[in-house]
Amino acid sequence: MGSSATATTTGESTRQQPGLACEECRRRKARCDRVRPKCGICADSGRNCVVLDKRSQRGPKKGQLKDLRSRLMLLEQRLVGQNDAPSLPQERDSLGCPTPSEKVSPEGDLVSSRASTDIGLDTCMGSTAGAFALFGSTSGSDKMPPLTPDLSTASTANSMAACICKGWQTEPAMFSTSPFPQIPLTPQSTTAPSRMPSISLAAADPIMPDVRVHPFAPMVHKRRYYAWASDPNASPARTALRSAMRTIASAMSPQFCDIGHVMYASTRRMLETQDACPETGLPWMTRLKPPHEQRKMHHERIQAWLLLAYYDVLRKSEHQAFITARRAFRLLRLSGLCEMDIDAYSGRQGDVATCTPPAETTWNMQMCSSENGADEAVLQQDWISVEERRRTVWSAFLLDRLSTMVNDQPTMLMEEAVTKPHACTFSWYFSADLPISNQFYTRLPMSEAEFQSGTQEPVSQMGFLIEATDGIKASNSIQPLPPFAHCVVVANLFARCMTHCKMAMQSPPMSAPEAHDFWIRHQWLASAAANACESTETRCDPMLVFTRILAYSASLSLCSTANATSWQTLDHHLMAMACKPAAHQAASEVVRIIKTAPRIAFFKMHPFFPNAIALVTSFLNADVPYLPSTRGGNAMDAIQERQDAVNELLAALRRSSQVNNLAAELLCKLELDIGQAASDGSIYG
């Protein structure tokens, strides 16, 4: 085709012909000759030759569509809110949130004066138009759009930080050494804004204690929390607890995980501000004060620190979690909550009467109960507040005991102290006949149904930790324990097993008396762990599932301890080998629980759940399996079964790693260990 010859210029030619190619040639990716009114290809194929003179750009730049959607959401919300909240601009100015003229991403402006203070979804969605404005629906349908505003950009995080953190401030140089981001704050030192940056976070307050926090830290009375959660004038301790609730919920919610670090820094700064007082700001007591001069120690502060420690486990490092947990443990000691029921215990145990708590602890306990004499009688009858303080104590105790699973951390809250100085041997420590005085003079938590109902105080009182721990050994008092109390007792038993392991690993080859003491402790712990495994059905409670897995993990730890110790006699070696059948049976039960658990259950498990799974995985991967069925059968089937069990446990860790940083770290470590062992041929060869 002569007309398709390339255009020539003086001395040079161009590959690109002048004009635009037709749509048919573009679709075929063919070279169009640009002949008008119909090019050669269209003429040969008999198709219409269509040429678009004005063509749009290749596509929007990155983030333009999300920015446009967010602006439409903001515009529709403002149009709907003109009738419901005419004073929205004034309230926005009082919050100190950035205005559109400051060129900040509009997601940070999604704050409604009404929805930010309400705690219920029903209140926030009082009308259909309000629901459309809440979810940014522009189509008129009742469905939530699949696309949500992008919360990962730096401008969005900065605007949210400005909205979150306005409202509390300290002296500029007070926390200059803090490793957390320095956020500009206002002169209110111990309060925080009641309005959060995201309308969804404020609206989701009612489900946060139920779905996110309560399954592993049931220390808050839900109805009372709902009563003051929407109060803009809440006390500093309650404001910090509310912020900590939202922080831990953001860590366990994929849609809010991007703003969790900002909320964490804000909540931690708020708690540090409250701790910066003469009574609690120093790691020692400068002088003893009478009760009327001491400040009241609110248990909500301890609860907030505990939630931040769990956030560190989920999203930060283990080391940071232990640092944060120690802040809560120290406040717990200063408050005197560990001695709440010392009078009841002293009446039942005569040897406890000689153990008097420090003067400052007694005074703090009095101040924790009431601020004046007029309110003391009323608060003594408020059994719900007393039970909430008990649950705060045991939540801290549970966190301390489960911390021993990570890197052999020592316990910070001592369970008991021996009254006689010469009786401080570890073999006496586990003896049921030992005269001991429990330092935790606090009753175990009651059942969840009785606590949350709040109608009438239960007639029967719960027992104490030492009684329940001995009850596991006797297998006679573990049955009536509610899930939370049962988890506390089993966690204490697991911590004893870990201490038993440390004592065996640190000592040189045992002599005959030392070996005798070792097996006395070992048999006591093995019997208690076996009874704990058989005591409670898992049902659908995440706390019960975790407790049972923890009890099985204790049996595995005892087996590993017995087989890792060098024995001088054949009898002791045979006793160590006899522990393997029970240990492998426990590992099989853990795998069965993991297989039958629904996928959603992994998002409700305790933050330390990955440690128990990793312990079982390491046991199956490192130890030669006890295979009674292979004596006359095929050993390869049993080895393949063990590989399938390891893969099932790794899959559970992989699911938990979506919301748990500890699970991701343990998964990476186990995969490296398994790969190295497989390459060396020491396991599956």
Curated annotation (Swiss-Prot):
A molecular function (GO) term: zinc ion binding
Domain of life: Eukaryota
Start-end of Low complexity biased regions: 1-14
Record key words, sorted: DNA-binding, Metal-binding, Nucleus, Transcription, Transcription regulation, Zinc
Signal peptide range in chain numbering: none
The keyword Transcription appears for this protein: yes
Coiled-coil parts of chain: none
Subcellular location(s) of the protein: Nucleus
An annotated GO cellular component: nucleus
Protein name as catalogued: Sorbicillinoid biosynthetic cluster transcription factor sor4
DNA-binding region as annotated in the record: 22-49
Reported function: Transcription factor that acts as the main regulator of the gene cluster that mediates the biosynthesis of sorbicillinoids, a diverse group of yellow secondary metabolites that restrict growth of competing pathogenic fungi but not of bacteria.
Region span, Disordered: 1-20, 81-112
Annotated knockout phenotype: Impairs the production of sorbicillinol.
Listed PROSITE patterns: ZN2_CY6_FUNGAL_1, ZN2_CY6_FUNGAL_2
InterPro entries with a match to the protein in the record: TF_fung, Transcription_factor_dom_fun, Zn2-C6_fun-type_DNA-bd_sf, Zn2Cys6_DnaBD
PANTHER family (alphabetical): C6 FINGER DOMAIN TRANSCRIPTION FACTOR DBAA-RELATED, ZN(II)2CYS6 TRANSCRIPTION FACTOR (EUROFUNG)-RELATED
